[in-house]
Amino acid sequence: MKLWSILGNSQRLDGGAMFGNAPRAMWQKWSPPDELNRIELACRALLATPVNGKTVLFEAGIGAFFEPKLRERYGVVEDRHVLLDSLSGAGFSHEDVDVVVLSHLHFDHAGGLLAPWREGAAPQLLFPNATFVVGAEHWERARHP
């Protein structure tokens, strides 16, 4: 089996929320905040193959599905789908993935399942050959919020 750390879209989130009770004077050395106190966070997925003959992706990150105004609001840095670029760099496409495992269905973990935003286009699910795996409680909560 081979494992790849696959880079996805990055996002900027409030540094105080991310570092909890650690003083800003400490964490800003490692992660300088912007004018809104947001720090850049990388989103990474894990690709494993073969796992019982399957290509498995763990997590999908935030992706590039937001329209520009929402992309800015949620601090998504790139306007392209970095996860797809990174899969390609590892020699794979989203069509090659047999199984996608998600820890939960928040948009910053599952947004990468959608194609990049296009003006006037309906959302499009990627990974057409994959079986999606998520815990039953998370699935039911998404179905019945």
Residue map of PLM features:
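Conserved beta-strand hairpin/beta-sheet module of binuclear metal-dependent hydrolase folds
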Residues: K2, G8-A90
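Active-site HxH/HxHxD metal-binding segment of metal-dependent hydrolases
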Residues: T55, G61-P145
